[in-house]
Amino acid sequence: MNSVTVSHAPYTITYHDDWEPVMSQLVEFYNEVASWLLRDETSPIPDKFFIQLKQPLRNKRVCVCGIDPYPKDGTGVPFESPNFTKKSIKEIASSISRLTGVIDYKGYNLNIIDGVIPWNYYLSCKLGETKSHAIYWDKISKLLLQHITKHVSVLYCLGKTDYSNIRAKLESPVTTIVGYHPAARDRQFEKDRSFEIINVLLELDNKAPINWAQGFIY
């Protein structure tokens, strides 16, 4: 692991080598906006903004991308809910349960699945207010997601409205699926078969499929 310093909390960002090409720009962009972000109480706390940068990218095939953290109790790991109470991760788990037949589980975490990096486009929000920090993170969000897409084969974005123009923001030719958000109304996410489709796309690209059942916690 490497680390860099920034002028505001969290003061130190620890990161895996695979993120090195974007770190100097990240530091510059963060120092420009941090004082604005940090006027608010945030979800997650600043020490957890950049926790996913500890993840390597060279072994990732799929990025599952949400829009921003839970407005309360964000852990810095997208979709993670240690007490398994958040609607989004419960819906994701039930979708994978239907796909795999696994039923006796106590939780689900995308971050423990080989080949997958869960990501949030915006890395924080004001406590209790989704998308409230979008304007501050925008340059950083674009920089980091572009870097991720240089490594993965499939980018799966959760949120049809939020991601309607995502392809315009990406430079790498990555296969992109834009699906319903797990919290979408009318149970639209239930009918979404993106997790299955991702594995078909990986096979077409001669890559190993994702074992989605690995995310279950018992």
From Swiss-Prot:
- Report the catalytic activity: Hydrolyzes single-stranded DNA or mismatched double-stranded DNA and polynucleotides, releasing free uracil
Sorted alphabetically, the keyword list is: DNA damage, DNA repair, DNA-binding, Hydrolase
GO BP annotations listed: DNA repair
Q: Which InterPro entries match?
A: Ura-DNA_Glyclase_AS, Uracil-DNA_glycosylase-like_sf
Under the heading Gene3D superfamilies, the entry gives:
Uracil-DNA glycosylase-like domain (3.40.470.10)
Result of changing R187V: About 60% loss of processive DNA synthesis but unaffected UDG activity
* Entry annotated with the keyword Manganese: no
GO MF, one term, reads:
uracil DNA N-glycosylase activity
Enzyme Commission number, as recorded: 3.2.2.27
What are the catalytic residues?
D68
Superkingdom to which the source organism belongs: Viruses
Complex and partners? Homodimer. Interacts with protein OPG148. Component of the Uracil-DNA glycosylase(UDG)-OPG148-polymerase complex; OPG148 and UDG form a heterodimeric processivity factor that associates with OPG71 to form the processive polymerase holoenzyme.
Instruction: Give the protein's biological function.
Output: Plays an essential role in viral replication as a component of the DNA polymerase processivity factor. Excises uracil residues from the DNA which can arise as a result of misincorporation of dUMP residues by DNA polymerase or due to deamination of cytosine.
Family the UniProt entry places it in: Belongs to the uracil-DNA glycosylase (UDG) superfamily. UNG family.
Protein name, entry field: Uracil-DNA glycosylase
